[in-house]
Amino acid sequence: MRFYNREKELNYLKNYVQLEPNSILFVYGPKSSGKSTVMMRVIKELENSNIVFFYYNLRKYATPTKDEFLSIFFEKSDKKYLLNKLEINLKIFKFGIEENFDFNNIKLNDVFAKINESINTVIKDGKRPVLVIDELQKLKNIYFNSGKSLLNELFNLFVSLTKMEHLCHVICLTSDTLFIDNVYRNSSLSEASEYYLIDWLKKDDIKKILKEEGFNKKEIDYCLNYLSLPYEISQLINNKKLGLSVEETIKRWINIEADGIKYLIDTSDLNEEEIYKVLSKFKDKIKINYKKDVKKEEMKYIKFLIENEILFYDVINGIIKPTSVKKWYAIKEILDK
């Protein structure tokens, strides 16, 4: 898929990884807003620099077990870090571990010791390590010896690597905003974390892209009311090549989204009337303010809609909105029926 205009986000992250590590960076945003694409572009554009990227994309895997976590993050080798052979187009690395290392009896402290060894070796080689984990929250149900939570202990390690020792940048990408909410309210991370939002595309950028792709003024004006995410533009371009009009494509999207939302509500054990009451907050506006517009008793319905990717919660700015503009129109459609 073409890399659409994300120069602001691209430059921010390129500059960020070249500063001294001082905090964990959480890059968050609505699903499909382009977080992973931007991060991979950063890695690609800096592949000839002295930065060594350890990039782990957990969205590629089913929710991993302890053993799978170890095989994802480590490669048996006589080197402390080595190129990931499975990634052909990106120069990214994995942590190295001895050939005879026994994964069956490994303790969490051993895991962290090996990560530290790899990072320190990168630094000794005159290079700068950056650890990137995409969809980090998928590790939240993994426990090691004595019931230790892998994710909680990883956060402690990340604080040590960044804020305390300034050895390595740690960047975590996620679209799970309830996970971000938990992190944001975690007192042990409050002074050691930063947050960066990659949100919907701006209308001016969408207009420019569509013009470059040969859409006429009428089509562009229509699209600007509905588009917000990069993949939507790609689908729209492909559908036009297949003979579908802009109106047909977008109406089809909204119908599919509306049917999906209705099915979700119809099959939920939650109070249907209360869910619709929450959705009605978006009948006349695309976003609401968490502090002003949400009551305590509404939170379980809000959470339900966030968990099912109907709504997006920007915890840092206190805003709740649909995950996309087309989702907003789907919400409005089911409210009108």
Swiss-Prot record:
Transmembrane segments: none
GO MF assignments: ATP binding; ATP hydrolysis activity
Chloroplast found in the keyword field: no
Descriptive protein name: Uncharacterized ATP-binding protein MJ1076
Residues given in the record as ATP binding sites: 29-36
Keywords in alphabetical order: ATP-binding, Nucleotide-binding
PANTHER family: AAA+ ATPASE DOMAIN-CONTAINING PROTEIN, YALI0E33429P
Entry similarity comment: Belongs to the archaeal ATPase family.
InterPro entries: AAA+_ATPase, Archaeal_ATPase_domain, ATPase_dom, MJ1010-like_2nd, P-loop_NTPase, WH-like_DNA-bd_sf
UniProt-listed Gene3D superfamilies: P-loop containing nucleotide triphosphate hydrolases, Winged helix-like DNA-binding domain superfamily/Winged helix DNA-binding domain
